[in-house]
Amino acid sequence: LTAAKRTAQLAPSASPLEVLKCALLEIDTGTRCLHMTATNMEVTLRQDVPLLAYEGGDTTFAIDAKLLSAMLANLPGNTVECCKGDKDTLALSSDHAYYQVAVTSGKGFPRMNIPIPEGMVKLSGVPSMVRRAAFATDPNNSNMPLLRCVNLRLTSDGLRAVGSDGVCIVSAKGDKQCTGDQTFLIPAANLEKLAQLCEEKDTFSVGMADRQLVFVKEGFQFAARLMHGSYVDTDSLIAGTQNTFTVLSDSEELRRTLQTATAACMDNRTILHFDGNRLTLRCTGEVGSSNAALTVIPLTGQPFGDYCFAVDRLERCLRALRGTVTLGIAQTGMLTLSTEDAFYMQTQLRITAPKAKPARKKAAKAA
């Protein structure tokens, strides 16, 4: 059931190719395994499910991935009996429950090869790493495809994941034991697919082959196509950013305050007003204005002034970060947020006066 659920998550619900909505099932009598494969042409997942018993020869067929997952979820018991009929039908039964559905031969299913890289490194903590980096990318940018990507970098200090949409940048720490000297550009959407299919404790062997980044653990192989290009030099940008002042706060409290302050926000803009140990977030719209404040701890410099930032980007950042956060304003007015595991920067917006409502004309009196 777990394997079927993963397959259903990866197989696209809507696709011009009906076969991509399917899971390819291959029974291998040599290894006594059921190989379950799904692909959306960008990423491919293959899982090996051990068979308790099997009669017959090697068999290959395709079945709607979400239908398979739904049927297995509703069958009682811990084991299920599968019987492939002669006329492209599959019967699933367990205890007193029974399903019979149509399947196809699987001949039209795209054979996406998952290569085994020669040099591989160990990696764990994938979901948290993806959460801290993928939010800053721009998944719908067709003009600059690299902004749809997360830049994974193996360094001597461990793995780093960088994301940017051109307005904000985040550099997040990954597994400290995953060291090396390589860089990979992978679409954030594909990396998020992997994060949905695994747990924080899962340890993968990771390597590159045939322009794909491959993640392998027992009974599980995931391959994602890589992008090519030169990514922005984020190390230089971060190193060149000097804060004029910094304050200490809690990411969750800051997120709640932002949520409260944006009740009247109509233009995706919020003003951060710093005044010593008090930070006030203000929004003004056609329907009115709102503000919310919280107490912060000044760390360096003199926290004072008004700075305007995009609400949606700041909100996504605060949802991704955890724990204590150091919030700063750089000389250029750029906002910085730093935690133990990530460093975030966002370009400020110009503060504009709210638009005044046009005065209503008095109705002319009837003669």
Predicted regions and their residues:
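Structural preference for solvent-exposed beta-strand-turn elements
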Residues: 1-367
